[in-house]
Structure formats: structure tokens, C-alpha cells
Swiss-Prot record:
The keyword Lipid biosynthesis does not apply. This is Carbamoyl phosphate synthase small chain. It comes from Methanococcus maripaludis (strain DSM 14266 / JCM 13030 / NBRC 101832 / S2 / LL). The gene is carA. It catalyses: hydrogencarbonate + L-glutamine + 2 ATP + H2O = carbamoyl phosphate + L-glutamate + 2 ADP + phosphate + 2 H(+). GO terms for molecular function: ATP binding; carbamoyl-phosphate synthase (glutamine-hydrolyzing) activity; glutaminase activity. Composed of two chains; the small (or glutamine) chain promotes the hydrolysis of glutamine to ammonia, which is used by the large (or ammonia) chain to synthesize carbamoyl phosphate. Tetramer of heterodimers (alpha,beta)4. Its EC number is 6.3.5.5. Keywords: Amino-acid biosynthesis, Arginine biosynthesis, ATP-binding, Glutamine amidotransferase, Ligase, Nucleotide-binding, Pyrimidine biosynthesis. It comes from the Archaea.
Length: 366
């Protein structure tokens, strides 16, 4: 099958198509992970994006449903140097997702690194793609909006409340689902925290009705500036009970506290990002997947920098200044402590969330 990748600057990259025979538009990004292609493809944060893998060989250990981070592939397309085995090809076909192989992924990565993320079109076809078609495909790319103009979260958030009961419940969390990864839920439940997953646009009153001990705002795709409903809800929850956030949830909390976010040139996507705890000086190797960040020049008033990225000094975590009252606790991290895929250096943060919930539950009882 033929494959073609058309970039907004007019670059045409031809290769061998695999997966579904179709055509997609999206923001072209790169991921530096050496493993975890199943988790990456099924991560809802990749909605609206075509992923280029920098590691040269994909598909060499198959596909298992237990690795899924959602109910299926959420990325728009997949770009690889080489593919091996049939399972990855069949996996993409099952979810009507195109892929292209046999291309110079180093060239693509360098281009993104120097110019920034790029609007692109990926087309696969059993028929040769002509020069005349290239012109039409490029026009589609140029007309495609920037990802910040697309409201992606409604496409990946749950449509109804889902409850995950812990076997031996120690505490309860309401998770505001902006496109949550399943491993985040799993990390909480296995620690004795029951999770009530609610839609991204749930109001304060509904969230409080579940009597949670803390709230977690999840990861998800797109620009946090589009999340006005969720930001307003988080504003209303702060001061009522502890509030935490991961990735997009971190950015939403930043805005709710009065801070600002901005779009990174090419983002952080991979399992090898070093993050420093500002207070202790400890360094964690973390898994990351984001294209926006907290503006370090406008850290919310009454808050402080908690973690920073050692590659580019971007903000990786903030917290509201310490309060003796647990209900005022607010903290969030930009990276993914659950990994999925990636290192588990920061999974202790889920222990801290659960401990926070247990303490607030006891405080409420008194």
C-alpha cells in the first residue's frame, strides 16, 4: 500500500502505507519512547495528533488489550521508520487509523524540533498517489486549523459517570475526565482509592454530591484555554476540598489559580524527561506528553514552583502555598507519574494523593 505524508510547508514524504486505507489530518509530533507504542496510540491526549516515533522499530512485541490506556486508538495517525509483525498493522486497521513506514523519522524529528509542530496530512492508498493529488492534499493541510482552535476534550471525555470501587476503600476521589489514561485510575484503585469518573463539564454541585475526599483533574488533549467550563468548576472547588491535577489538569489548575499557559515549540513527548523537585533537589525521570505549559513568569499568586524540567527549565509542578487547613490544598504536576509507558520514579505521588484523601476524610469526620 502507498503512503504519503504532506506537511504544511509543502514538504512531501512518501513511504509504505500500513493500517487502514484512509486519509487524516492532524498536528505532527514526535515521541522519543523506545517502547510503549500501544499505550501511546491509545492515550486520549494524542487526539488530533499524528505521532512520529523516533525509535526506529515498532510492532516487535505485538499488541495486548491489557496495555490499552482507553477503549481504542485515539491518535490520528502513526509514522515509523520500520514496522515488524502483523499485529500493529491489524491494530491500526481495526480502528481505521493509517500508518506510514519506510520514512526518515530522524529527518521528520529534526524538522519538528527546528520549526515546531506541523499541521500535516497522512494518506494511505492501494493506488499510486499522483502529483496532482499532492496539490489537493496540501491545500487541505493549509486549510486545517491549529490544534489550539479545536475543542478536543469533548471527544475523549466520558459521557456519563463511571465508578471504580476499590476493594478495601480507604478514600474516595472524583476524577474530572478530560481524557484520562486508564493507568491513572488503576494507580488510585490499587492503593485503596475508589474513583468516581465524571465528564469534563461536570458542575461543582454534582462533584460534591459524591462526597469525595479529593478531586483529581486528569490529562487530556488540546489547549487548556479552551477549557473554560472545567476551569470555572475547579475555581469553585478550590477551598472546599483538596484539588490535584495531572498534565492538562495541571494546566487547568494553573489557569484556575490565576496563572497563564502557553504553547511549547514542539512539546515534551517521551519517557526520558528529567524533572527536579525544587525543594529536595531530587531528580526523577518521567514520562511526558504535552504541548502546552505553565508560564513560569506568571506563576499564580499564592502558589509556588514545585518541580521543573531540567532540559528546558519549564514548569513541571506547582502548589498553593502551604495551609494548615487540608481543604485548601492544591497541587499539580505537568508530567505523568503513572507512566504508561515509562519509568515509575514518580508513582509515589499517587501515595501522596491517597494519603491526602485519607487525612481529609478523617478531618471531615471530626
Amino acid at each position: 500500500m502507498y503512503g504519503i505524508l504532506v506537511l504544511e510547508d509543502g514538504t512531501i514524504i512518501r513511504g509504505e502505507g500500513f493500517g487502514a486505507e484512509t486519509e487524516v489530518l492532524g498536528e505532527l509530533v514526535f515521541n522519543t519512547s523506545m517502547t510503549g507504542y500501544v499505550e501511546i496510540l491509545t492515550d486520549p491526549s494524542y487526539k488530533g495528533q499524528i505521532i512520529t516515533m523516533t525509535y526506529p522499530l515498532e510492532g516487535n512485541y505485538g499488541v495486548e488489550k491489557e496495555w490499552f490506556e482507553s477503549d481504542g486508538i485515539k491518535a490520528e495517525g502513526f509514522v515509523v521508520k520500520d514496522i515488524t509483525g502483523k499485529e500493529l498493522d491489524e491494530f491500526l486497521k481495526e480502528y481505521n487509523i493509517p500508518g506510514i513506514s519506510g520514512v526518515d523519522t530522524r529527518y521528520i524529528t529534526r524538522k519538528i524540533r527546528s520549526k515546531g509542530v506541523i499541521r500535516s496530512l497522512l494518506k494511505t492508498s492501494t493506488n499510486p498517489i499522483t502529483k496532482d493529488e499532492e496539490t489537493e492534499l496540501l491545500k487541505k493541510v493549509v486549510d486545517y486549523p491549529d490544534i489550539s482552535e479545536i475543542d478536543l476534550v469533548p471527544e475523549v471525555s466520558t459521557k456519563e459517570t463511571v465508578i471504580y470501587n476499590a476493594e478495601d476503600e480507604k478514600t474516595r476521589c472524583v476524577l474530572i475526565d478530560c481524557g484520562v489514561k486508564q493507568s491513572i485510575v488503576d494507580c488510585l484503585v490499587e492503593r485503596g482509592c475508589s474513583v468516581v469518573k465524571v465528564p469534563y463539564n461536570s458542575k461543582k454541585e454534582e462533584i460534591i454530591s459524591y462526597n469525595p475526599d479529593f478531586v483529581l483533574v486528569s490529562n487530556g488533549p488540546g489547549d487548556p484555554e479552551n477549557m473554560s467550563e472545567t476551569v470555572e468548576t475547579v475555581k469553585n472547588l478550590i477551598g472546599m476540598l483538596p484539588v490535584t491535577g495531572i498534565c492538562l489538569g495541571h494546566q487547568i489548575i494553573t489557569i484556575a489559580l490565576g496563572g497563564k499557559t502557553y504553547k511549547l515549540k514542539f512539546g515534551h513527548r517521551g519517557g526520558n524527561q528529567p524533572v527536579k523537585d525544587v525543594e529536595s533537589g531530587k531528580v526523577y525521570i518521567t514520562s511526558q506528553n504535552h504541548g502546552f505549559a505553565t508560564d513560569d513568569k506568571i506563576v499564580p499568586a499564592g502558589s509556588e514552583l514545585m518541580h521543573m524540567n531540567l532540559n528546558d527549565d519549564t514548569v513541571e509542578g506547582i502548589r498553593k502555598l502551604e495551609s494548615s487547613d487540608l481543604k485548601n490544598t492544591v497541587w499539580s504536576v505537568q508530567y505523568h507519574p503513572e507512566a504508561g509507558p515509562g519509568p515509575h520514579d514518580a508513582r509515589f505521588l499517587f501515595d501522596e494523593m491517597v494519603e491526602l484523601g485519607i487525612k481529609f476524610k478523617a478531618e471531615k469526620a471530626n
